[in-house]
Amino acid sequence: MSDSVHRLAVISLHTSPLAQPGAGDGGGMNVYVAEMVAALAQAGVDCTVFTRRSSVDQATRVQVEPGFDVVHVDAGSIDLPKDDLAEVLDEFTAALAEHPDVEAADAIHAHYWLSGEVGHRLKHDLGIPLAVSFHTLGRVKAGAGDAEPAERISREQRIVQCADALVANAPPERDQLTTLYQADPQRIEIINPGVDHALFSPGSRAGARRATGLGDGPVLLFVGRIQPLKGVDLAIEALARMDRPDAVLVVMGGPSGTEGEAHLREVRRLAADLGVAERVIWQPPMARHVLSTWYRAADVVVVPSRSESFGLVALEAAACGVPVVATAVGGLRTVVVDGVTGLLVPSRTADAFAGAIGSLLADPAHAAALGAEAAVHAREFTWTRAAARLRQAVGELCRGTLVDCR
């Protein structure tokens, strides 16, 4: 085993860092993997990301930049849904075990429980340390009202007990790991994600409105996948409860999961039933350089999620100088400083969100002050800093003794 990290095998089984965030299985984790690996590569760590092939058009190997390659692995049918991916864990693991980039790796960084299971097996086969970022936890989602299979939770528990390091995005995720999974706090590394400040930075709202074709009235923006966890239904209900008939809500995202299309139909019907269908503007996921313009066009970015391990959308909005109104859950409590950079809503109800959003629309000077502070706060979060922390943490694992769960 090496005494430092020069080569890192990154496992992202269920979704590729090359995928468009905001639809299907693409979300904040895609951004995280892509940005973290790019920053590691720029710091001199050779990284290979292994993901399952989900399209016949995907090349077997793609070099994103020097030190950052993506390998698409054949495992199961191309169109296998995420809920069935546990069926291909053996096939995926076997393919990685024979890959020269895995055999040469100093350590493994696995993302999400499916990848964590693969990493757990490879750790023991190869005798190299395993760091795991869960991004979401089954017990947390179940507590927020989302049904999660018992298999996921039991496997998460096993991974927690054997991973050499657990990477938490913020203190609340650390607390969830220790409370819900009895994780050893000494093996938890809190590493805040970053944001690309070259893309996401303050700018002219008037110019952004012209570029997006939005009018002069109040604009609320929701960015994310159309799934119950993200709460677009709550954003629509809040719009309907507000006494601001001049306000519009832009919903930027696409359906996700096996019930995604059905949920999209439900929320569209909800907007019609509440009489605000004409004030909800539906947009597909956008490339990130275009997304930043939509952030700047907004008066408020709304993040009504049931749970979030961090909340990259909230951080991107903050970096653009836009106040965020978010649920007071998980890592959103790290990204949004309540009353300073935005507003946290402790009660996840339409009335509570309508009141918080309405208070900012009624006081543009206060909203502008929050946005300015948000941009300052966001400067604390960079991918260079996050990668340096991760590199240090994994390097220490390489010099230590592996956790043995067998």
Kindly give the residue locations of the regions a language model identified.
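Conserved acidic donor-binding segment of nucleotide-sugar-dependent glycosyltransferases
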Residues: D338-G339, L343-A350, S359-P364
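Short hydrophobic beta-strand element within catalytic cores of glycosyltransferases
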Residues: A314, P323-A326, V336
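Short alpha-helical donor nucleotide-sugar binding micro-motif in glycosyltransferases
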Residues: P285, T293-A298
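Conserved donor-binding/catalytic core segment of Leloir-type glycosyltransferases
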Residues: L214-K230, I236-L239, V250
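N-terminal subdomain of nucleotide-sugar transferases
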Residues: M1-H72
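Aromatic "clamp/platform" in nucleotide-sugar-dependent glycosyltransferases that forms part
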Residues: R306
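Nucleotide-activated donor-binding/catalytic signature segment of Leloir-type glycosyltransferases, i.e.
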Residues: E261-M286
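A short, well-ordered alpha-helix in the C-terminal region of glycosyltransferases
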Residues: S359, H366-E380
